[in-house]
């Protein structure tokens, strides 16, 4: 303050006024000395008063600033020690040099000085030393503390966010969740019942669902004979997930006692606040659950993540063919509106994919449109390769086969693209065709997965069907003009059915035999089917070696794996899994081996007690309840086996690891 006061620039105005006043007083002496004397005395008095006033003001201001500085310092010290923010200073060895009282109270200590961070909290020490961020929530003695670290200054701030985190937790667990419950086969089960039996079945299902809703605190409202709306929250949803949605089993078991097994599909929307968006998510989840065959729960979050529960039973075969007739008519109209049709299956097509594609090509030709099969002859399994060799003998049919590069050149905005035996964009032969095509049709028999082709104009997915070839055969039957198949075309479709049903032993319904009967009547050669499916001696020996390495645990889970340096094709891996399933005591089989494309392939089979589709989905794959597969990249066979065992353990949730 004194330096400020003594600065000359500060005193210049006073000097100037004093000099001016003295000059005026001296001037008066020239005219009249008495007036000059009085003026000089007056100027002296005023000058004295001004200097005295300035010095007094300076002292008062200095005292005020001194008092203010003391109070600010005192408040700062009190704030550092008393405010509800923890402050901590570290030395170069990560020992505490200083901390305020709030932080000491958090650790329930009198003083923290001299202690190391590791003594107080290992997570805190790890965060300060190796943390990738400058802030983190850490729990200390029951409190949630937000820690902000300034590493260069070795300074840490601690904010108590316990109440905030509790409010956030309550908000999250009380957030609204919407569910749509659908009775999968209610209409089919009750259509043959009299009024009394139908009323009893209706009352049974309603009472089971109402009891379940009351137990969990769910609001349940029936909106139609086969549909309910349920309102719950995230906390209740967590409880339902822990129970693995036992209501699915309860409804199935209770109705089975009345010789009419009804199954549920539940679509749940969660993770958003908007009610219209919740409703959209719930309906989308229900469509997903139904597309996977029903008898399961699909939970879709706002971020797009989907979880599945249930799916313990095979989809029930639909007794009505109305849908097949409607789809056949719609497909005919789409073909008629297109300039040409491209037909594409999945990568490394098997007999079902290739047979279904040949069947669709026949549908296209029967509607007088140009059609092409998109296939890479060098990338097919052994059976499909033999079928392609047979196709080469028929010039007209072989001329319809084109490579993916040719398809990219042929496609126009009016071209219809039909995808068979898959619905996943990542699995099609040429993914770029999906982005070039404006009109896409999907025909598949696999349970619908989270990944799906975007915006198809027609979807025909029936998980109850044995194969895509079965679905295509029915579409052929309902074409308005009677279609006459050649021997090879009928044989290709029949071979697709035989492969996917394991010679009519798995997933075979009455409509499967109807389709096979139709194809046989069209001239399908069963001997040629066997020739197409023949296995080489070398493959037989490889399969036997894989089976020899199989280990079967006490739960009936069989796992076989190849050596790290052995490469087997996917067909051989699948055949080995099929063979393992025929062994006594085996309820599910898994075969792991390196593939030719560098990935590790896993084929899974079951008799129905274990849902291998769900297990494979945990590894990024998919399929059916009894037949599924997955491909893992950048892993060894041993690492793939470990991931598989973890997925099996997660599936059983609490069961002993296999």
Swiss-Prot record:
The protein's Enzyme Commission number: 3.1.4.59
Keywords: Cell membrane, Heme, Hydrolase, Iron, Manganese, Membrane, Metal-binding, Transmembrane, Transmembrane helix
Residue stretches spanning the membrane: 12-32, 33-53
Membrane topology recorded in Swiss-Prot or TrEMBL: Multi-pass membrane protein
Annotated effect of mutating residue 107 to A: Loss of heme b binding (by fragment with residues 55-162)
Coiled-coil parts of chain: none
DHH, as annotated region: 340-497
A GO molecular-function descriptor: cyclic-di-AMP phosphodiesterase activity
GO (cellular component) term, any one: plasma membrane
Residue ranges constituting the GGDEF domain according to the UniProt record: 174-302
Source organism phylogeny: Bacteria, Bacillati, Bacillota, Bacilli, Bacillales
Record PANTHER family: BIFUNCTIONAL OLIGORIBONUCLEASE AND PAP PHOSPHATASE NRNA (PTHR47618), CYCLIC-DI-AMP PHOSPHODIESTERASE GDPP (PTHR47618:SF2)
Gene designation per UniProt: gdpP
Region (PAS-like): 83-162
Protein name in UniProt: Cyclic-di-AMP phosphodiesterase GdpP
């Amino acid at each position: 303050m004194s330096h400020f006061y003594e600065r000359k620039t500060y005193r210049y105005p006073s000097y100037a006024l004093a000099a001016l006043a003295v000059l005026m007083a001296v001037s008066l002496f020239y005219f009249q000395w008495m007036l000059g004397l009085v003026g000089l005395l007056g100027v002296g008095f005023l000058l004295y008063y001004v200097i005295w006033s300035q010095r007094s003001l300076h002292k008062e201001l200095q005292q005020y600033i001194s008092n203010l500085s003391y109070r600010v310092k005192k408040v700062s010290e009190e704030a550092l020690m008393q405010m509800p923010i923890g402050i901590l200073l570290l030395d170069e060895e990560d020992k505490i040099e200083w901390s305020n009282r709030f932080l000491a109270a958090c650790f329930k200590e009198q003083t923290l000085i001299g202690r190391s961070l590791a003594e107080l909290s290992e997570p805190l020490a790890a965060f300060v030393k190796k943390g990738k961020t400058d802030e983190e929530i850490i729990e200390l003695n029951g409190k949630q503390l937000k820690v902000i670290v300034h590493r260069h200054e070795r300074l840490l701030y601690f904010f108590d966010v316990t109440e905030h985190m509790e409010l956030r937790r309550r908000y999250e667990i009380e957030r609204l969740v919407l569910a749509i419950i659908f009775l999968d086969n209610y209409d089919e089960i009750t259509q043959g019942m009299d009024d009394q039996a139908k009323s009893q079945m209706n009352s049974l299902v309603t009472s089971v669902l109402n009891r379940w809703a009351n137990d969990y605190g769910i609001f349940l409202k029936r909106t139609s004979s086969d549909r309910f709306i349920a309102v719950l929250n995230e906390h209740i949803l967590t409880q339902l997930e822990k129970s693995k949605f036992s209501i699915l089993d309860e409804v199935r078991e209770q109705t089975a006692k009345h010789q009419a097994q009804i199954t549920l599909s539940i679509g749940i929307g969660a993770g958003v606040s908007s009610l219209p968006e919740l409703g959209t998510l719930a309906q989308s989840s229900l469509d997903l659950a139904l597309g996977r065959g029903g008898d399961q729960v699909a939970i879709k979050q706002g971020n797009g993540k989907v979880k599945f529960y249930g799916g313990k039973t095979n989809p029930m075969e639909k007794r009505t063919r109305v849908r097949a007739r409607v789809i056949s008519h719609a497909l005919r109209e789409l073909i008629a509106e297109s300039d040409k049709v491209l037909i594409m299956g999945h990568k490394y097509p098997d007999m079902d994919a290739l047979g279904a594609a040949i069947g669709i090509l026949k549908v296209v030709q029967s509607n007088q449109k140009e059609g092409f099969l998109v296939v890479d002859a060098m990338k097919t399994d052994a059976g499909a390769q033999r079928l392609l060799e047979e196709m080469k003998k028929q010039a007209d049919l072989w001329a319809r086969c084109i490579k993916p590069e040719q398809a990219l050149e042929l496609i126009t905005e009016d071209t219809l693209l039909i995808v068979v035996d898959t619905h996943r964009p990542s699995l099609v032969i040429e993914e770029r065709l999906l982005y070039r095509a404006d009109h896409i049709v999907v025909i598949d028999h696999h349970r619908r997965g989270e990944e799906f082709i975007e915006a198809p104009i027609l979807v025909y997915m029936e998980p109850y069907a044995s194969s895509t070839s079965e679905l295509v055969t029915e579409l052929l039957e309902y074409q308005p003009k009677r279609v006459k198949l050649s021997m090879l075309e009928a044989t290709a479709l029949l071979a697709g059915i035989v492969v996917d049903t394991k010679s009519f032993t798995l997933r075979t319904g009455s409509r499967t035999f109807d389709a096979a009967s139709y194809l046989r009547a069209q001239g399908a050669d069963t001997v040629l089917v066997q020739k197409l499916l023949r296995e080489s001696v070398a493959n037989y020996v490889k399969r036997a070696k894989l089976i020899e390495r199989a280990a079967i645990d006490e739960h009936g889970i069989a796992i076989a794996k190849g050596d790290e340096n052995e490469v087997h094709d996917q067909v051989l891996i699948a055949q080995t899994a099929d063979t393992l399933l025929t062994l006594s005591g085996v309820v599910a089989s898994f075969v792991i081996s390196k593939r030719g494309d560098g990935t590790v392939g896993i084929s899974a089979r079951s008799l129905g007690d274990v849902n291998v589709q769900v297990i494979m989905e945990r590894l990024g794959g998919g399929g059916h309840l009894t037949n599924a597969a997955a491909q893992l990249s950048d892993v060894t066979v041993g690492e793939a086996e470990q991931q598989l065992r973890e997925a099996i353990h997660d599936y059983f949730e609490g069961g002993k690891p296999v």
